[in-house]
């Protein structure tokens, strides 16, 4: 009887132990598929982020197509002295580059600050050709500005001819007038004493505050000049006689 009573107790204890074990094992078994699926979802999400990262960077940087940028750079180089397009030119560039007007405006705003200074120092029609030196670029800029300004020329008056200094006149020049020295005071007078086949003496008659007279030596042939002076004096005397005869018949 006692052995029969012990057997149900042992079976009960075994059943309880098995049930406890089943309870302990069942959560682990049920959680393992959920954990596996969560890990897979996380890994898929991470790979999706990695794959989507380059596209996101491209969108954020806003790179334009290389062909469109080349068209815009060529236009800027041709109009580098007026490097911002008008509305009509923007529409024309938009058709060529397949870009919007806002993209073209933003590109020119940035390019005028970053690309244009280097572009102004380039040489030739191709902006990729080598740089100029600073003096060459400055000389080219001056030539372009001088070409747009018309040259001013006109006949010089007799005053400008008379104001030339004596040392710059040619040897064969003949003049009986007094030639003022450039830069001299108004009170100074320049007199010239001419003799045939002799030295030319130039003396300044100045005021007390002016410097001492300066003499310059210049060899010249004034024989023909002397003949003209004599002829002019003779002609003047003849005219004076004719006037006197007419006044006193």
UniProtKB/Swiss-Prot annotation:
Protein's name according to its UniProt entry: Homeobox protein TGIF2LX
Q: Which organism is it from?
A: Miopithecus talapoin
**Primary subcellular site in the record, as a coarse category:** nucleus
Q: Where is the composition biased (Polar residues)?
A: 28-46, 159-172
Similarity section = Belongs to the TALE/TGIF homeobox family.
Gene Ontology molecular function? DNA binding
Q: Which SUPFAM superfamilies match?
A: Homeodomain-like
Gene from which the chain derives: TGIF2LX
Note whether Nucleus occurs among the keywords: yes
């Amino acid at each position: 009887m006692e052995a029969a009573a012990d057997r149900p107790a042992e079976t009960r204890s075994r059943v309880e132990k098995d049930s406890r074990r089943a309870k302990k094992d069942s959560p682990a078994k049920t959680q393992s598929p959920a954990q596996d699926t969560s890990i897979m979802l996380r890994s898929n999400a991470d790979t999706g982020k990695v794959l989507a990262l380059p596209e996101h960077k491209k969108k954020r940087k806003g790179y334009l197509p290389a062909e469109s940028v080349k068209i815009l750079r060529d236009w800027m180089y041709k109009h580098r002295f007026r490097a911002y397009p008008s509305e009509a030119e923007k529409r024309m560039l938009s058709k060529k580059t397949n870009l919007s007007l806002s993209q073209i405006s933003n590109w020119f705003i940035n390019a005028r600050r970053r690309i244009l200074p280097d572009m102004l120092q380039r040489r030739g029609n191709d902006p990729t050709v080598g740089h100029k030196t600073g003096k060459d670029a400055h000389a080219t800029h001056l030539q372009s500005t001088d070409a747009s300004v018309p040259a001013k020329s006109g006949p010089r008056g007799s005053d400008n001819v008379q104001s030339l200094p004596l040392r710059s006149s040619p040897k064969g020049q003949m003049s009986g007038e007094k030639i003022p020295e450039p830069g001299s005071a108004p009170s100074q007078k320049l007199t010239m004493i001419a003799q045939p086949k002799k030295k030319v003496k130039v003396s300044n008659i100045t005021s007390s505050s002016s410097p001492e007279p300066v003499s310059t030596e210049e060899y010249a042939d004034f024989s023909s000049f002397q003949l003209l002076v004599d002829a002019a004096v003779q002609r003047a005397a003849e005219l004076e006689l004719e006037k006197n005869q007419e006044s006193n018949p």
